[in-house]
Amino acid sequence: MSPSPRQRSTSHRKPLPTVTWRQGVHLVGSALWCDALRAHGLCFVSSVRAIPRARKRAGTLLTTQTTLSLLSALHRAPEGAQLLSPLRRPFFWGSLRLELFANSDLPGSASLWVKLPSEERVIVAGQPSEQSSELLEPLQLRQAETLVIAAPWAPLHQELPTLDEMAHSVRSERALAQAMGVPLLVRCSSVVKLAELVGTLDLGPLKLHVDLHRAWQWCQSLPRFPKLHSVSARTVAPGEVLWWPHAAPPPKLPVTPRELHLADGLSRAGLVRYARASGVRQVYLTAGFSSEVAAALSAHKISAAPLGPPQQLALFGELAAP
């Protein structure tokens, strides 16, 4: 006997997604959120990037001690309960098996590996970086079926510029700014990238956005971190360099500066390498989705889709799959 139309439609129904967006990444059927914008039951925070401004509560905060300390230095640490975990130390939270592991992005930053009661495994990666630094733990990998990740520079770069190439860009742009009689605004969100660059540049005292300045001061106690003087600044003289995070509103300068954006995280090829090495079949991008990124993953039979608030999804365009 052939199945009824109702039976046929049920048998071909797509499985429900493992993750969804609910003011942050939410693991469906659980009380676990990741890098969420509001307070929830248990909220994993991958790095200081995930809490861009101060807020009162974030539910029970799951993160590393280093990230919490850096959040406090930036005046962004939420109030409430905390569940601090070292890296590479699996534990159970209810029916979920969890593990934090290094993503080589910022001091204290981590990715989260989750094993669901269904045995399905999910990685919430944050914004990992494969550009190694002696200031951070090397990038680590775990195996999973689903990956949630931010790779904002993947649509623009097949491979990210090297540190030497970035330093050359800063020197060249500064020379042009000096010739034009304007400041140079360097957009850089990573205090680690900044530390590696200034070691190769002769810029004098660092003039930094207040958040970069606070992070820089906090990092002075870390081993091997460069001991260079920095000041919090909102303006600089023509020909000088002002370092500014990507997400911060531009400073109000007397003249329009030259502007240079420094990439970090994963390139398009780096994202493909990360996904393949993790064995995933589905990738959700909280930043960095594009048709080119989806096609690069699709070539390896990995589906890709954007994950974020509705206004963000409109920018991403249509989801793509192999």
Describe the role of every protein-language-model region.
Residues 139-142, 165, 200-205, 299-302:
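Short, solvent-exposed amphipathic alpha-helical segments in soluble enzyme
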Residues 165-238:
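Hard-cation-handling environments
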Residues 35-37, 84-87, 101-103, 209-213, ...:
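Conserved beta-strand termini and adjacent loop/short-helix elements that scaffold enzyme active sites
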Residues 2-13, 203, 218, 222-322:
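C-terminal regulatory/interaction regions
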Residues 62-65, 80-85, 204-213, 301-310:
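Short hydrophobic/aromatic-enriched beta-strand-loop microsegments
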